[in-house]
Amino acid sequence: MSTSSFVHLHIHTEFSLADSTIRVPEKPEQAHPKKAKQANLLSRAVELGLPALAVTDLNNLFALIKFYKAAETVGIKPISGADLLIAEPEHTPWGMTLLCRDHAGYLNLSQLISRGWLEGHRPEGGVAVHPDWVRDHHKNLFALIGRHSLAGQLFAKGRADLAEQQLADWQHVFGNGLHLELTRTGRDGEEPFNQFALQVAGIRGIPVIASNDVRFLVPSDFLAHEARVCIASGRMLDDPKRPRTYSEQQYLRSSEEMAALFTDIPDALDNTRTLAQRCNIEMRLGTYFLPNYPVPNDETLDSWIRKQSHEGLEARLLKHPLAPGQTREDYVTRLEFELDTIIKMGFSGYFLIVADFIQWGKQQGIPIGPGRGSGAGSLVAWTLLITDLDPLPYNLLFERFLNPERVSMPDFDIDFCMERRDEVISYVARKYGRERVSQIITYGTMAAKAVVRDVGRVLGFPYGLVDSIAKLIPNTLGITLKDAMGEGETNDNASAELIQRYQAEEDVQELLNLARQLEDLTRNAGKHAGGVVIAPNPLTEFCPLFAEHDENGRGKNPVTQFDKNDVEEVGLVKFDFLGLRTLTIIDWAVKAINKRHARACIDPVDITALPLDDIPTYKDIFASGNTSAVFQFESSGMRRLLKDARPDRFEDLIALVSLYRPGPMDLIPEFTARKHGVQETIYPDPRTKNILKDTYGIMVYQEQVMQMAQIVGGYSLGSADLLRRAMGKKVPAEMAKHREIFREGAAKGGMDAVKADEIFDLMEKFAGYGFNKSHAAAYALVSYQTAWLKRHYPAEFMAATLSSDMDNTDKVVGFLDEARNLNLKVLRPNINHSVYMFEATHADTIQYGLGAIKGVGQSVCEAIVKERLHYGPYTSLLNFCTRVASAKLNRRALEAMIHAGALDELGKNRASVMLQLPEVIKATEQMSRERESGQNPLFGNADPSTPAIQLDLPECEEWPLTRMLNGERETLGLYFSGHPFDPYRKQVKELVGCDLNTSALERILGSQQRGNGEKRTWHPEVNTILAGLVVSVRRKGDSQVFVQLEDGRGRIECSAFSDALAEFGHLLTRDRILIVKGGLREDEFNDGYSLRIRQCWDYTQLCTDYAQRLLLRVDLRTSDAWERIDAILARYRPGNTPLRLDLLLNSTHGPVAGTLDLSGAQSVRIEQSLLDKLQKDPAVSTLKVKYTPPWVQ
């Protein structure tokens, strides 16, 4: 510490979540002022020359590790502490600041804070600790008591005697560790309390300390701080009733400013330094503490992993063939090498722990992925059943996972079925103790759009203004306001309209300036998606815990207060329990298949034992790009790539997964050309052929870079991994050193320096975007499994896929389209046949799931199915309502099922069932009341499937088709019985020439797509004409409108900007048949296609304005045929479209044909209703309208 006489001991940071704008650097180097992206606590402290700091966030230690590391980086002494809210029944909750004397004090504070979150939830929100808990955990802690304490409250009420007694009580607890906090920040009541505190200090010998109760860095941050407080409390800045708790003086003052402020109380300044010197917490970072894995008494961890691995290898090789070119001895040699490395590095326990919970999960039938990340390159992992991919056939490297030349924790990422992942976490908690197992915290931040909306609200700006500004911020993941304002490293995400409005409007300037001060501050705490820690001792010996609360105010689902990086810093080992929905889909599909197989006495499918050379899977799924719903291969770009690459072996799938990313994507045309012999495969050196042959001489994987370094440069694989990492970081000095080592190694193999440099440069280029082959291989296996299921069991696979996304209407619509493309019949929801999920009822049939109906919950569906299975099908609406509990089957759910068609079997038609509903509900409610009261005259029938009461229920004609279809769309998210576009389809197609289905759009773009030899990273627009029904309209500010068109065969999003919007905006409304002309292109963001509108027309109006002639072929040989046709035509006169009638008439010589042209007063208006009426008349055999459309004039 420097000789400065003052130290700030009471500072809230952004991690107090509600009342501070002080940022804590995410990385230690950002503590340096020149390296900080924005001013933060440490960078400002360095500028002020502060010797030490204490972070004392409210009820948490979230920031501790980040603060500790950053402070040490810049030579500032870190002091750990926290503000605790203390509650007891007879008093308003009050505050006390605790500082850690040492590591023992940290453990006590950790336990105290954890107890608050687990036991101290308050009904009004937040948490507090009981004074007795502080007394239980006070050792090695210093306490600061100030104006916000209970003593301060009592003094403010005129009870100085009780206030002094309070201080005496806490002095008895903390002894010379108690300090009285004095503040001079311009807030009411400060100076009287200071005088009282000085008086008590003199009487009782309690030291006083000066404090600025810091909440922001500089005075100009006060408004942003107040805005943050208002955001957290739901108030507006100009609300006269909101509490003004803070002042503009609560900034990080310099030592000189504090000295001037407390010139009359120098001891208060000196005591901060003295107390800071007494605080000497030393966090033990970087040492790992593995949980204790139990092994048999006569075994050690090391001997047990050897035994289990060798036994596992024998079991694996009984079922799996040896890798080509490998012997059993090769496997044993590789296994021993890996075991020696694991044991030497002290990670036997880690592997055994992971193997244990994965094996338990598999024994319970929980779907678990074959591997993820570099861990799939370990043979030991394969023998212990951690992974399901033999690494030897695919040349996967152990050193990429665990490098003996670089000591770091191994890190297995494990994919579990989404539905059952928590079962495995519960097993781990039971095995090692719930107090030793926890998930990990994650912090939410104030993102760009959200902070603009929040700031707009607290400023009291009109919603329309704020909403319009928020919508101008691009929908790019991780975008900042700086990016949107065109001030980022590139202008890729700049919004021209946002910039223009910022420059032109004062309100927008105020809004965005304030929002930028708050953007990216930590906002809330949540739970990490998959991270779990297992400790050898109770977790509070390593870090405090945070918890939500249940309805009784008890903490539930505790998580560590340190995030995934910081828990590892304090020595806790993180295990990633990740949820992968694809595993759930595979599991559901396989169970459905095997259920059908069991009925037919066919052997069950074992998805883990599929042959990886199934020709139909490669030919019909991968090579044809038929990969919608196939894991990792479903995007339109990938489907197009597959058609070019035509993969026919598993190694191709691994390569394509790795290549289809920014950077290596440019290599795809060359890869494809070499695969199919269009280009010659060339190797950098003959010795590299075995390394690069599977990728046709192109470096695709990180492992290939490592093997090149080994074979050509003489590196060990461990050193080669260090080289790969260095190449990825591109540090010039490091690269120069490695280049020389590589040259020397290459020279020993007879290679000159020029050739060595050429290969080194090639490796350096590819190392930057080479992919982890172990991860690609493991995920390619999951991809293959889904493709195999789709090819051989499409109904079960698509039913599982649909079920996995039942609550996502857009995805359901797309998957239903794909099911129909596979020639599968999809039956409407039906209470007498459907279950909760989609179900394959036959090899070519899927029954719609009841759970996919909006407004119908899972419990309702399960009750319907359970009752049906016990007592048989439902026979009427009354029968249905009386048999299913009314508490679950409410009117809203019933109406939704009627509109969805699920009750079609229960009445004459949907309109009749809806008409009967009120009377049936009334009757069933009466029956329910009488049953509950013991009067049960209606339930004399022993068979619950047949209600004793009979009602005379009305019937009516069916709804018009449009109403039926709209009801389906409202409840299912799609039109099921048809499509409103159907009546227009024939005429529209004659006009525009194609549907909106994906294959048609692909054909339009096909001529513009790149060939095998052409490299292109952009996708051109193709001018085209399309048509469809407008089903949704979305506006973005005043300058952009997005409409979605559907035609029952497909859908597309169309956008209109500036000039087009000004001219055609009035046509962009729902339920209109719209013809659009514009630029069609691939939409990679939404994985589909989009069209930029340049012109558009209302189809109905176009029919009237541009129909040149109506052609009819009419049979007039029946007596009243002409009268009917003429009567129809008469209703559409006068009009502008002449007619040509090809007539078939009777004559004395038999049937004769003639032609009649009608024009002038006989011309008609072309409307869809006219065409419908004519087509329905039996005398009309042919109808055609000739148009001269405006786009060809």
Swiss-Prot record:
The keyword Cytoplasm applies. Its EC number is 2.7.7.7. Keywords: Cytoplasm, DNA replication, DNA-directed DNA polymerase, Nucleotidyltransferase, Transferase. SMART domains: POLIIIAc (SM00481). It comes from the Bacteria. It catalyses: DNA(n) + a 2'-deoxyribonucleoside 5'-triphosphate = DNA(n+1) + diphosphate. One of its GO terms (biological process) is DNA replication. It is found in: Cytoplasm. The keyword Acetylation does not apply. It is an enzyme of class 2 (transferase). SUPFAM superfamilies: Nucleic acid-binding proteins, PHP domain-like. Signal peptide: none annotated. DNA polymerase III contains a core (composed of alpha, epsilon and theta chains) that associates with a tau subunit. This core dimerizes to form the PolIII' complex. PolIII' associates with the gamma complex (composed of gamma, delta, delta', psi and chi chains) and with the beta chain to form the complete DNA polymerase III complex. Belongs to the DNA polymerase type-C family. DnaE subfamily. DNA polymerase III is a complex, multichain enzyme responsible for most of the replicative synthesis in bacteria. This DNA polymerase also exhibits 3' to 5' exonuclease activity. The alpha chain is the DNA polymerase. This is DNA polymerase III subunit alpha.
